Swiss-Prot record:
It is found in: Cytoplasm. GO terms for biological process: negative regulation of JNK cascade; protein urmylation; tRNA thio-modification; tRNA wobble uridine modification. It holds the Pfam family Urm1. This is Ubiquitin-related modifier 1 homolog. Its main location: cytoplasm.
Length: 101
């Protein structure tokens, strides 16, 4: 039997997709042998799929102010932010509110 996978969906909108190769939706199969929190996911994203200007998406170990994060349509602030443990089929949406003038 193969390695267990944790399947989740990442979505990017309102300009956040521009930092990720202009891809608005990604289905991921993460290593199911480890515990995946949003903090771990952000590190993975930075290392693997963040293609443009990471300073516009990340600030330290978290998303920068102006990036909204919704997990299954719920504000991540209500779910524990970086400590939230990802579950199978979670949908994580990143929305940029940062727009030039």
């Amino acid at each position: 039997m193969g390695t267990p996978e944790l399947k989740i969906i990442l979505e990017f909108s309102a300009g956040a997709e521009l930092l990720f190769g202009n891809i608005k939706r990604r289905e991921l199969a993460l290593d199911g042998n480890q515990k995946w929190t949003i903090a771990n996911l952000l590190k993975w994203m930075h290392a693997n799929i963040l293609t443009e200007r990471p300073e516009l998406f990340l600030q330290g170990d978290t998303v920068r102010p102006g990036i909204l994060v919704l997990i299954n349509d719920t504000d991540w602030e209500l779910l524990g932010e970086l400590d939230y443990e990802l579950q199978p089929n979670d949908n994580v949406l990143f929305i940029s509110t940062l727009h030039g003038g």
